[in-house]
Structures are given as C-alpha cells and as structure tokens.
Amino acid sequence: MSDLASLETSILDQIAAAGDEAALEAVRVAALGKKGSISALLATLGKMSPDERKTQGAAINLAKDKVTQALSARRDVLKAAALDARLAAETIDVTLPLQDTPADTGRIHPLSQVMDELTTIFADMGFSIAEGPDVETDDYNFTKLNFPEGHPAREMHDTFFFNPKEDGSRMLLRTHTSPVQVRTMLSQKPPIRVICPGRTYRIDSDATHTPQFHQVEGLVIDKGSHLGHLKWILHEFCKAFFEVDHINMKFRPSFFPFTEPSLEVDIQCRRDKGEIRFGEGEDWLEILGCGMVHPNVLRACGIDPDEYQGFAWGMGIDRIAMLKYGMSDLRQLFEGDVRWLSHYGFKPLEVPTLAGGLST
C-alpha cells in the first residue's frame, strides 16, 4: 500500500508540475498508458488471490480515479492559460484608426473615369460601343476615309509607320479611331449607331500633345439622319458631361476629308483664375469636330449614299478630361505618379451614372 501511495503522490506532483499540455500528456501516458505505472499495477490483479484482489483492486482503481481527475483539472487550467496567452499576444488596440482597404486607397485613373462617363451618356441615347485594332492598314486609316494620296496626314512626321511588307504595303499605328467606323460600316448594315473610344497615335509631344492619346468618335447612319440630330446629340452630351443644366454651342465651318459639310463645335465658358466654368460667361472653347459623313466614305464602305446618310463626330478624351477636372499638363496622365493619381483619381466603387451623378 505504501508503494501505491508513494506512486500516487509522485504522479500527482508531476501533474501539478506540468507546464503545458504536451508535458501533461507525457505524464498521462507514463501513468495510465498501455505500459504506464498504474496500468502495470492493474495487470497484476489477475495473479492475486480473491481477497488480495478485492483489497488491492479497490486501492489501485481509487488511485487511478484520482490521477484521472487531476489530469482533467490540470488540462482545463493549462487550456485556459494558453488561451489567455494567445489573447494577450493578439490584443487589438481599439483606439487605433481602422486600416484602409484596397477599395479605400485605390483610385480609378481619370481617363478610365471619363471613358466610363462617355459610355454612360451615349449608352443612355441608344449607342453601342465598337472597337478595333491599334495597328491598322493604310486603307482603313486613310484611303476609305477619303484621304487622297499625298495628304499631309500620310506623311512620316504625323504617322507611325511600320516597315513596308514585300508587296510595298505598310501597316501603321492608327492616327484616329475612324478606322473603327469603317470596320463597323463594312460589317453591319444600317441603321448604325455606335461610339468608338480607344487609343490613337501621332508623332507629337508637348504639354498638350503626347505620342499616344485617346479619342472617342461617334457614328450614326440612317435614311433620315441630319445635322439637326447631330446638334441635339452633341448638345445633350455636353450638358450631361460637364454637368450643367444649360450650355450654348456654336458650330463653325471647317474641313475634314471624311465629312461634308464639316463643322467644329465651340461651347460657352467663363475663365476665372485658371479655372474654366461651362454654361456661363462670354468666352468660347473649341471642344470637338463633326459633320455629315462624306458620300465617298459611304461608297467605300459599301453603303449607297443615295439611300443612306449619316453624321460623325470626334473628340480627344484626354483633352476633355483635362478641361473638366482642371489638369494642366497632358503628360501627367501617363506618368504613373501615385501622388497625382491620389489627387485626381476616383474611388473605385463610385461608378458614374446619369441618375446618381457622373463625377460624384
């Protein structure tokens, strides 16, 4: 009995001294495991006489129960201590400011924002979006758009040409998005109502010009389309884009090879200390070019000009973005300065809508 009491005391002391659950498990295995000390005593009961088995069995089982209870109690203590330590290590200081999420810190580039605004406005008028390749043929970029041979726009100082092919033909980086209009007229039957936003390229670089820039053009082809429709579309666009209730416009005669008649559009504005306010004042600002599609362009695209007529317009997305949001240097749009983008960019979840506001 004295040996059992000593063993029990030793095991209970080891349980109390266990500093973590791993050490406690080692004590349990040493005492109650298959080859444990108490398990070994229980195995000897079969060799005892009935009287000894009765006395020793009760004592050994009592010791086993005490060890089991002690193990359970110590395990609860160690689990609680481990949880307290983890909570202490992962303490959150509720007085610290919340960390910004990517949706809070990220910004939509002004050009992407303006493209979304443009597509929102024209989609509301029933226009669809047409796209085409940046690398174009001379035929689509010039010939089918009524640019005659020898036109200045074909010269190397305006256009990025690739090396000539074996047959002498040359590919180029499109100088406007008008080739998308050509592709649309060749692939679709009238009526047509599309806008063509995208990148364009010309050899030029200063504060108001870059070798790569963005344009959006619009095209309407139908049997009854006329300049009155064009004027209404552009008037409604300018009101919606510049977010004013009223705006005056002037249409001036101009020349573009692909339209006849050709017009340039000025809108009313007021210049005040470097800022431009639209819809008020006595100044005028050129905003875009437009006109009725030239009959030669319609014929080149397989459309009978005696049955259909249409109008088109085009504007620089970079320029109208600068005018609307007060940016002074076009080159900054392409420099990737995070500080600049943080100032001029837009929150990614504020999608422009006509109902909710384009630039809010």
Curated annotation (Swiss-Prot):
<keyword id="KW-0030">Aminoacyl-tRNA synthetase</keyword>
<keyword id="KW-0963">Cytoplasm</keyword>
<dbReference type="InterPro" id="IPR004529">
    <property type="entry name" value="Phe-tRNA-synth_IIc_asu"/>
</dbReference>
<dbReference type="GO" id="GO:0005737">
    <property type="term" value="C:cytoplasm"/>
</dbReference>
<keyword id="KW-0067">ATP-binding</keyword>
<comment type="subunit">
    <text>Tetramer of two alpha and two beta subunits.</text>
</comment>
<keyword id="KW-0648">Protein biosynthesis</keyword>
<dbReference type="InterPro" id="IPR022911">
    <property type="entry name" value="Phe_tRNA_ligase_alpha1_bac"/>
</dbReference>
<dbReference type="InterPro" id="IPR002319">
    <property type="entry name" value="Phenylalanyl-tRNA_Synthase"/>
</dbReference>
<keyword id="KW-0460">Magnesium</keyword>
<comment type="similarity">
    <text>Belongs to the class-II aminoacyl-tRNA synthetase family. Phe-tRNA synthetase alpha subunit type 1 subfamily.</text>
</comment>
<keyword id="KW-0436">Ligase</keyword>
<dbReference type="InterPro" id="IPR010978">
    <property type="entry name" value="tRNA-bd_arm"/>
</dbReference>
<dbReference type="GO" id="GO:0005524">
    <property type="term" value="F:ATP binding"/>
</dbReference>
<dbReference type="InterPro" id="IPR045864">
    <property type="entry name" value="aa-tRNA-synth_II/BPL/LPL"/>
</dbReference>
<keyword id="KW-0479">Metal-binding</keyword>
<dbReference type="GO" id="GO:0000287">
    <property type="term" value="F:magnesium ion binding"/>
</dbReference>
<feature type="binding site">
    <location>
        <position position="260"/>
    </location>
    <ligand>
        <name>Mg(2+)</name>
    </ligand>
</feature>
<dbReference type="Pfam" id="PF01409">
    <property type="entry name" value="tRNA-synt_2d"/>
</dbReference>
<protein>
    <recommendedName>
        <fullName>Phenylalanine--tRNA ligase alpha subunit</fullName>
        <ecNumber>6.1.1.20</ecNumber>
    </recommendedName>
</protein>
<dbReference type="GO" id="GO:0004826">
    <property type="term" value="F:phenylalanine-tRNA ligase activity"/>
</dbReference>
<dbReference type="InterPro" id="IPR006195">
    <property type="entry name" value="aa-tRNA-synth_II"/>
</dbReference>
<dbReference type="InterPro" id="IPR004188">
    <property type="entry name" value="Phe-tRNA_ligase_II_N"/>
</dbReference>
<dbReference type="GO" id="GO:0006432">
    <property type="term" value="P:phenylalanyl-tRNA aminoacylation"/>
</dbReference>
<dbReference type="GO" id="GO:0000049">
    <property type="term" value="F:tRNA binding"/>
</dbReference>
<keyword id="KW-0547">Nucleotide-binding</keyword>
<dbReference type="Pfam" id="PF02912">
    <property type="entry name" value="Phe_tRNA-synt_N"/>
</dbReference>
